[in-house]
Swiss-Prot record:
One of its GO terms (biological process) is negative regulation of DNA-templated transcription. Residues 60-96, 214-286, 513-551, 723-753 form a coiled coil. Residues 1-324, 458-681, 730-763 are annotated as: Disordered. It is found in: Nucleus; Nucleus, Nucleolus. Residues 11-20 have a biased composition (Polar residues). It comes from Arabidopsis thaliana (Mouse-ear cress). This is DEK domain-containing chromatin-associated protein 3.
Length: 763
């Protein structure tokens, strides 16, 4: 490698010699220029100056020449310094070339065959050749930049030489001028015309000299460019030879390398390349000692990589499995399952403490509604079939865990998913009073949610009577004095049978809705007429009772009279309410047996309910009217008090007088319409009509029309009595059907041999 570097230095030496040649040529030319100036001086000695202005110009020229001399000296010094710098740069590039060559040798030594990865030696050689070419291109670029710097330096030198020529010319002119001054005396007598001719000749000669000098400059520049190109060619040839030799050496070294190389050495070579790239980017000037420092760093890096590549602790030794313990998860699941049906205490009363709810839940045989209710009450938890009723009866209000809003929204969503009919069933079980026709689904949900949040008794409860019985007694308050033939025992027996016919009655409601829609408008008109008729009847009864009381019942104190009357009224209202419940239940059973009879029964029940509400008003009016009369009469005469006592005593005695009063009603009605048919005739006609009529389509108005056709009379004023007759007939039919059903059930039970079913029916 040392011989190659010497060969590369030779062209630089040639360059220096070639650069010195133009200076020698310039010196010869300057000598020639001096001879020309001497000849010109001789010619000028022959001429005479006209004015003293020439002296001033000469002085100025002298001063300029001095300044130019100084500037030329400074520029020469600068040029010398630049040439020295260029020489130093050339030497530095040589050193860098040597360092790169050594690095390339080291890289070639470090690279080996990659037998594991399937990479051949030829591939590695190709890669190295490509890298060497890239390095050569970089070197060529650097050398071109250096050559351009050299050419610039040559141009500067040429410019300095031109300045020197001009300075020499100025010196020559000075010498000529001094000669002219000495010979002024001799040339004064000569003619002025000769002076002008000489001046013209001198100007022409100066122009010729300047042209010659320009040509000489152009020739010099051409010679310089030729020399620079020759030097470049020589440098390129030397570079190519060096690169070829280096590539050959690298190939030889790679072939000599052993095939059993390790992966650690490959990593070292890769790190070397990265370090070289970073160092080449950071600084172009690089000494030979840096390679050793880079190797130390590379070794440190390889050691760190080896440490990282060391096998870590095996996966089985890690304590990951301790976090996943199946036993704990199973224990948690068992605990949750055990807590499923623990009913927590809420803010309200227990449902078992509310008598109506408790009775309905215990009587409920179809557990579908209860199964749907259970997850709503207990946060989506489904209980066992045997525990559903006990859990529901133990419910006392929602217990919120966590966010109350989210829990409330979930409960409302569950209620919204249910149909309207199921919500009605929930309200029936929980004894929440809702009118099915008018209330919307949203209103039902809000009422249910409010009740379930804090369960409470929805009505007044007295003794063992339930809320439902209390409501029914309030509806039947108008019939205190209208006794029925049915006994209270019938109510209990009918209540036992009501459970059987509930499903059938629910199905019948759908059929009845159509008929009810037609009869709603008529029922309102009928209510008004009935109210008027009942008011008239009540007035007549009061007048008759007053007359009877006047005839002979002993006087009693005013204070004692009202107390027993109120208690007896309560007893009578309870009895009548039981009778009405039996009638309604019988009507529902009939509808279960036949859908046709169900439609009629519902129509009549609706009418009866319509009847029951206005008589409450009448009784209130009646009682208030009586009190007013007693207050007024107590001041005027003692007869009024005796009348009042007499009117209250028959109520104390027994319910028999009320029955007699009820019997008097049809007699009075018959008396009013003497020409009209009697109740017996109407009953017979109604029975025949009911046998013919299709219950799915027929309504109460249709029956009235048929009766009107038979009797050829307008029976609208007797609507109430006709309704009562129809209801009685329907209840009879229902009782007959129930008896048949009972017989069938008993026969089935006897066949099955199960006695438990009978107990459930009694319960």
């Amino acid at each position: 490698m040392g011989e190659d570097t010497k060969a590369t230095i030779e062209p630089t030496a040639n360059k220096t010699t070639s650069l010195e040649k133009p200076s020698e040529a310039m010196a010869g030319k300057e000598n020639a220029g001096g001879k020309e100036t001497q000849e010109l001086a001789k010619d000028e000695d022959m001429a005479e100056p006209d004015n003293m202005e020439i002296d001033a110009q000469i002085k100025k020229d002298d001063e300029k020449a001095e300044t130019e001399d100084k500037e030329s000296e400074v520029k020469k010094n600068e040029d010398n310094a630049e040439t020295q710098k260029m020489e130093e740069k050339v030497e530095v590039t040589k050193d860098e070339g040597q360092a790169e060559a050594t690095n390339m040798d080291e890289d070639a030594d470090g690279k080996k065959e990659q037998t594991d990865d399937g990479v051949s030696v030829e591939d590695t050689v190709m890669k190295e050749n490509v890298e060497s070419k890239d390095n050569n291109y970089a070197k060529d670029d650097e050398k071109e930049t250096k050559e351009t710097d050299i050419t610039e330096a040559d141009h500067k030198k040429a410019g300095k030489e031109d300045i020197q020529h001009e300075a020499d010319k100025a010196n020559g002119t000075k010498d000529g001028n001094t000669g002219d001054i000495k010979e002024e005396g001799t040339l004064v007598d000569e003619d002025k015309g000769t002076d002008m001719d000489e001046k013209v000749e001198n100007g022409d000669e100066n122009k010729q000299v300047e042209n010659v000098e320009g040509k000489e400059k152009e020739d010099k520049e051409e010679n310089k460019t030729k020399e620079v190109e020759a030097a470049k060619a020589e440098v390129d040839e030397s570079k190519v030879e060096d690169e070829k030799e280096g590539s050959e050496d690298e190939n030889d070294n790679e072939k000599v390398e052993s095939k059993d190389a390790k992966e650690d050495e490959k990593e070292e070579t890769n790190d070397d390349k990265e370090d070289e790239k970073e160092e080449s980017k950071g600084s172009k000037k690089r000494g030979k000692g840096t390679s050793s420092g880079g190797k130390v760093r590379e070794k440190n890096k390889t050691e760190e990589v080896k440490k990282d590549a060391e096998p870590r602790t095996p996966f089985s030794d890690r304590p990951v499995r301790e976090r996943k313990s199946v036993e704990r998860l199973v224990a948690l699941i068992d605990k949750d399952s055990s807590k499923e049906f623990r009913v927590e205490k809420g803010r309200g009363a227990y449902l078992k403490d509310i008598p109506n709810v408790a009775n309905k839940v215990m009587r409920k045989r179809s557990d579908e509604t209860l199964k749907l209710l259970h997850p709503i009450l207990f946060g989506g938890r489904r209980g066992k079939a045997a525990q559903i009723k006990t859990n529901i009866l133990g419910f006392s209000g929602f217990v919120w865990h966590g966010d109350e809003k989210k829990a409330k929204e979930k409960v409302k969503e569950k209620l919204e998913k249910c149909t309207k009919e199921k919500l009605w069933e929930f309200c029936d079980v929980l004894d929440i009073h809702i009118t099915k026709a008018t209330t919307k689904k949203e209103d039902i949900i809000t009422k249910l949610f409010e009740f379930l949040e804090k369960p409470h008794v929805t009505g007044d409860v007295t003794g063992d009577t339930t809320v439902s019985e209390k409501e029914k007694s309030s509806k039947g308050a108008k019939r205190k004095r209208t006794p029925k033939k049915t006994s209270p025992t019938a109510g209990s027996s009918s209540s036992k049978r009501s459970a059987k016919s509930q499903k059938k009655s629910e199905e019948a409601t759908k059929v009845v809705k159509k008929s009810l829609a037609h009869s709603d408008d008529e029922s309102e008109e009928e209510k008004e007429e009935e109210e008027k008729q009942e008011e008239e009847k009540a007035e007549e009864k009061e007048e008759k009772k007053e007359e009877e009381n006047e005839n002979g019942i002993p006087d009693k104190s005013e204070d004692e009279a009202p107390q027993p009357s109120e208690s007896e009224e309560k007893d009578e209202s309870e009895e009548h309410s039981e009778e009405e419940t039996t009638k309604k239940k019988r009507g529902s059973r009939l509808s279960a047996g036949k859908k046709e009879s169900a439609g009629r029964a519902r129509n009549k029940k609706a009418v009866v309910a319509a009847k029951s509400s206005p008589p409450e008003k009448i009784t209130q009016k009646r009682s208030s009217a009586k009190r007013k009369k007693t207050d007024d009469d107590s001041d005027t005469s003692p007869k009024a008090s005796s009348k009042r006592k007499k009117s209250e005593n028959p109520i104390k005695a027994s319910p028999a007088p009320s029955k007699s009063a009820s019997k008097e009603k049809p007699v009075k009605r018959a008396g009013k319409g003497k020409d009209k048919p009697s109740d017996k005739v109407l009953k017979n006609a109604i029975v025949e009509i009911l046998k013919r009529v299709d219950f799915s389509t027929a309504t109460f108005t249709d029956i009235l029309k048929e009766l009107a056709k038979e009797f050829t009379e307008d029976l609208t004023p007797r609507k109430s009595s006709i309704k009562m007759i129809i209801q009685e007939e329907l209840t009879k039919l229902a009782d007959e059907e129930e008896e048949e059903e009972k017989k069938e059930e008993d026969s089935e039970k006897e066949e099955a041999g199960g006695s438990g079913g009978g107990e459930e029916v009694k319960a």
